[in-house]
Amino acid sequence: MLLMSPVFKRSLMFGLPVAALVIAAAWRLSAVTAVEPSGGHRSLFELPVETLDGQLSTLEAYRGQVALVVNVASECGLAYQYPELEVLFQRYRDHGFVILAFPSNDFWQEPNDNAGIQQVCAARGVTFPVFGRSHIRGKDRSAVYEFLADTGETPLWNFAKYLVGRDGRPRAFFGSLVSPDSEALSRAIERALAESDPLEAQIR
């Protein structure tokens, strides 16, 4: 009969739940989930945002495009995704695709102010739209992330990705560890791009 010491028993008792939590978190960081908002605003494109220049604006200029909304952070270990996101943007931009990046210090890895973020993005060759630093979690989260939270998915870390259709409604959520060059993301973008533009449909 195998005898276990009290110390080993305690370690096992606490270690297994912790391991389960780590595995669950890792799975969510790599998750690809179809999503749909439950209420609130009808479209991402009607929401207010703050630009890197500190001006209040909206996302109206991107209405009718497929958008990938990403929470970014300059000092995150996943910041290598910046150039990968740029490649993705260049691949699909002429087909009606845009990446909308929202810097946040909610995970303590974006210490820069808006001016500093501009410098970082310029140094990394980023040409897709980047907005002012904001909250993406909690009671102070921005209107954009309040809207996206209605999908039931919230970022666990930097570089989580929401794919939004031409109608401004979320289509899918991709965890932080899903690479911008992943086949799953490319397929989802292409499916969304194949959907008809709701503005053109109204004109017809």
Predicted regions and their residues:
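N-terminal secretory signal peptides that target proteins for export/translocation
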Residues: M1-V7
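Hydrophobic membrane-insertion alpha-helices, especially the h-region
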Residues: M13-A26
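N-terminal "domain-start" segment that seeds a small globular fold
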Residues: S30-E60, Y80
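Amphipathic alpha-helical repeat scaffolds
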Residues: T51, N71-E75
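Loop/turn elements at helix/coil->beta-strand transitions in domains of secreted/extracellular proteins
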Residues: G64-A67, D94-V98, R124-P129, N158-F159, ...
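Thiol-/selenol-based redox modules, centered on thioredoxin-like
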Residues: A143-E146, D150-R204
